[in-house]
UniProtKB/Swiss-Prot annotation:
The keyword Nucleus does not apply. The keyword NADP applies. This is NAD(P)H-quinone oxidoreductase subunit 1, chloroplastic. The chain crosses the membrane at residues 30-50, 104-124, 129-149, 248-268, 300-320, 343-363. It is a multi-pass membrane protein. It is an enzyme of class 7 (translocase). GO terms for molecular function: NADH dehydrogenase activity; oxidoreductase activity, acting on NAD(P)H, quinone or similar compound as acceptor; quinone binding.
């Protein structure tokens, strides 16, 4: 039997080509995820640096200045130090719950970034239930805090976990009602559709102007969800030492801080998406994709401009959150729950009823 060497070479080249296609397919599948994770990491490092600089300015002192230019590498240095610290475990605690808690808190928040549009159709997963997915995922993080508090076998940690769960339930309901209002205004629960619905009318089409009361309630509720001052009752140092973080050290201790800043960033991004038109350039009847959709280079430039606009709006609200933390005193636990159940929830419910009534009358 004679085998043609040309046919064998063709078969080998074809198999190599198919293998390269599979490799490129795998790289193409994971590249957006890796890019998003890298961007989130850089964003968190910038937030940590901004918080240190803003707090130093408010307190009239010098902030970090030795680790890199203007101290911009201080957060990276702190993270590196925590990685090499020893991981201690409570002798009588539940080791499994103690170890799983920080991971659940971080992973549940990271999943929320998959539905956030950073520019025109620049989103990891454009789901029809994007907003509801964020609400569902954000309710998982307090479970991790409760597991950490229970697994620590410490009364302060356990009480902190209970506070985190109670605070989350109290402020997730107003958040959900406000998200339903935005969904009804846009006729879609997709984050991309909500941004495009606001982009049709430029600056005055933002939900900020159509729902000003809802915007302020959303801002307050998102701060409470992030457990930031004046709502950091689960970590109240004067009452609970360090809350659910009391028994932690090393990288697990650092994961809680990462989760806090990740949650703050994702909340600010959702404020931008739901109320500030996302990547909208704020010129009436013109938005980024129509302005730059001339050729391939124009589309890349338009996408870059959209990312810049989204991040500029996001970091504006991060500045507000950081300033609020360093200027307002902490609430008591009874004041926190009263604010959520007796004020924000009734106002959110009334706002929902009024909005839906006007929409039904306009049909």
């Amino acid at each position: 039997m004679i085998i043609d060497t040309t046919e064998v070479q063709d078969l080998n080249s074809f198999s190599r080509l198919e293998s390269l296609k599979e490799v490129y397919g795998i790289i193409g599948m994971f590249l957006p995820i890796l890019t998003l994770v890298l961007g989130i990491t850089i964003g968190v490092l910038v937030i940590v640096w901004l918080e240190r600089e803003i707090s130093a300015g408010i307190q009239q002192r010098i902030g970090p200045e030795y680790a890199g230019p203007l101290g911009i590498l201080q957060a990276l240095a702190d993270g590196t130090k925590l990685i090499f610290k020893e991981n201690l475990f409570p002798s009588r605690g539940d080791t499994r719950l103690f170890s799983i808690g920080p991971s659940i808190a971080v992973i549940s928040i990271l999943l929320s970034y998959s539905v956030i549009p950073f520019s025109y159709h620049l989103v990891l997963s454009d789901l029809n239930i994007g907003v509801f997915l964020w609400i569902a995922i954000s309710s998982i993080a307090p479970i991790g805090l409760l597991m950490s508090g229970y697994g620590s076998n410490n009364k302060y940690s356990f009480l902190s976990g209970l506070r985190a769960a109670a605070q989350s339930i109290s402020y997730e309901i107003p958040l959900t009602l406000l998200c339903v209002i935005n969904i009804s205004l846009s006729n879609s629960s997709s984050t991309v559709d909500i941004v495009e619905a606001q982009s049709k009318y430029g600056f005055w089409g933002w939900n900020l102007w159509r729902q000003p009361i809802g915007f302020f309630i959303f801002l307050i509720s998102s701060l409470a969800e992030c457990e930031r001052l004046p709502f950091d009752l689960p970590e109240a140092e004067e009452e609970l030492v360090a809350g659910y973080q009391t028994e932690y050290s090393g990288i697990k201790f650092g994961l809680f801080y990462v989760a806090s800043y990740l949650n703050l960033l994702v909340s600010s991004l959702f404020v931008t998406v739901l109320y500030l038109g996302g990547w909208n350039i704020s010129i009436p009847y013109i938005f980024v994709p129509e302005l730059f959709e001339i050729n391939k280079v124009g589309r890349v430039f338009g996408t870059t401009i959209g990312i810049f606009i989204t991040l500029a709006k996001t970091y504006f609200f991060l500045f507000i959150s950081i300033t609020t933390r360093w200027t307002l005193p902490r609430l008591r636990i009874d004041q926190l729950l009263n604010l959520g159940w007796k004020f924000l929830l009734p106002i959110s419910l009334g706002n929902l009823l009024l909005t839906t009534s006007f929409q039904l009358l306009s049909l």
